[in-house]
Amino acid sequence: MTKKLLPLLVLAALSSAAHAATPPNTLVVAQGLDDIVSLDPAEANELSSIQTVPSLYQRLVQPDRDNPEKITPVLAESWDADAAAKTLTIKLKPDAKFSSGNPLRPEDVIFSYTRAVTLNKSPAFILNVLGWDASNIASQLKKVDDHTLTLHWTADVSPSVALNILSTPIASIVDEKQVAANVKDNDFGNAWLKMHSAGSGAFKMRVYQPHQAIVLEANESAPGGAPKLKSIIIKNVPDPASRRLLIQQGDADVARDLGADQISALSGKPGVKVLSIPSAEQNYLV
């Protein structure tokens, strides 16, 4: 696995005139969205999907922002690892809620992992590393009490590897009750979650128009508190040069994935900041 630097251009708040075109309390992002197949965390496996899912969903744990090698709790309050038994005993945060208002339960975690493994979509191979598959997943996840569950795995991996796997987007926790209300033909709510959300992230889905835009609105009941922004508008702008133009005109606050020519043209411009953000990437030699 390597790290790739993804250029990100931010129109800084110091340029008030440039910001006049964007709505207050709203972040406008320009990027390509044509690669998106689904925003269901059990299926999302494209760059634009993976960039969006963490705003809508949380995992039990996640890498520390300043030290990615360290795993920190999110929906989990704490955990105990038993390497010999290949088991994690996880206590959930008792006050965590989904955007629907439903409280987080062990059943939601069990449902989330079970549906991801059973649906067996593109990113399911990540959970398969634990030895989980549709034939054994039911025996690997057990509720202990209203705020505790145990996770067992069969593969020969350490608890630290298991925790890293549980920090990936496919391990996002969905609201079982909300998803169950939108199941069709035993699809675990997959068709509905392609374009809706049922998570506990800082934002929830307001509308998704494929190949056009994604609009997110603040989740006021998000664990950790509501975000400062009221909404995020992600516009589909396939052409990098057009993304650059939106930044220059003040019609976007952020432009993702600009090429070297666009970065060179904007570097040093008043009110514009170039950020290079490390991103995990897998490369295969065939």
Segments from the language model and where they lie:
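Gram-negative bacterial Sec-dependent N-terminal signal peptides
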Residues: 1-19
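Surface-exposed binding/hinge segments that line
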Residues: 91, 129-182
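Alpha-to-beta junction loops
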Residues: 109, 147-149, 248-257, 270-272
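N-terminal lobe/hinge region of extracytoplasmic solute-binding protein
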Residues: 30-83, 114, 196-200
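Ligand-site clamp/hinge motif
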Residues: 191, 219-265, 276, 280
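Aromatic- and charge-enriched surface segment that lines or borders ligand/interaction sites
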Residues: 77-123, 150, 243-246
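Short, well-ordered beta-strand elements
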Residues: 24-33, 77, 87-90, 109-113, ...
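Gly/Pro-rich hinge or "lid" segments in bacterial periplasmic/extracellular proteins
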Residues: 167-227, 231
